[in-house]
Amino acid sequence: MIAAWIYAGLCVVTATFQVALYLGAPWGRWTQGGRYPTVLPPRNRTLAIATALFMLALGASVLGAADGGTPVPGWIATGLTGAVFLGHVVSPSRFERALWSPVSAVMLGAALWAMLA
């Protein structure tokens, strides 16, 4: 369960970052490929809040699977986390790569640990 809680905690951290973007934090260079270096435009803010909700759902899926629930949502979350990790690794934004590649790598490791435990 420790790995699942690590994963879920990092999902909450990521969701909090996305909510801050939605509210106008000038951190655009750290997300969405760095296309908007400061405040995201309205359309992209909507994407940020959707991402926040998505991250919370991923965290809940892995927690549920680790607590004896059906494993399918947890494995889907793990696979999606792997895709997110790859997206961060190849991001054109060096800021996004530097911050989110290591975070998503830890998330992927924690999700795999939780699902294989």
Where are these regions (language model features)?
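Mid-chain, well-packed structural core segment of small domains
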Residues: 57-88
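Membrane-helix boundary connector in multi-pass membrane proteins
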Residues: 83-99, 115-116
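Interfacial loop at the N-terminal end of multi-pass membrane proteins
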Residues: 24-48
